[in-house]
């Protein structure tokens, strides 16, 4: 069982900021009420709110899979109004999570080299 960290950076399409904020609030409510293994789910904006970074931390791969399942419809709606600048998953994912990520470009997986 290994903690995982996800980092995603999005560029919000012109005129879609309020829709993004609405969807983000819906996602936060789902995370707070349904995700039992999500340890962190934070959204940060740049100064003009044209881009955001989302930092997610999960207690294990099963929690990350559950999070993705809970946010499925909202994630699809968000991806329709943003461009993905980059995304990383940091940690040692299970074989099931690796299989779920196979064949997609984002997030890019980084496994530990040195940890404190």
Can you describe what each PLM-predicted range is?
Residues 1-52, 59-70, 80-116:
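Short S/T/G/P-rich N-terminal loop/turn motif that feeds into the first structured element of a domain
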């Amino acid at each position: 069982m290994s903690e995982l960290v996800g980092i995603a950076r999005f560029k919000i399409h012109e005129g879609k900021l309020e829709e993004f904020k609405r969807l983000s609030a819906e996602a936060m409510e789902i995370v707070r009420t349904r995700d039992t293994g999500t340890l962190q789910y934070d959204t940060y904006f740049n100064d003009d709110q044209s881009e955001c970074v989302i930092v997610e931390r999960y207690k294990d791969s099963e929690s990350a899979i559950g999070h993705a399942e809970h946010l499925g419809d909202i994630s699809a709606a968000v991806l329709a109004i943003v461009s993905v600048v980059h995304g990383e998953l940091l940690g040692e994912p299970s074989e099931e999570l690796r299989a779920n990520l196979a064949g997609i470009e984002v997030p890019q997986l980084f496994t530990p080299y040195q940890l404190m």
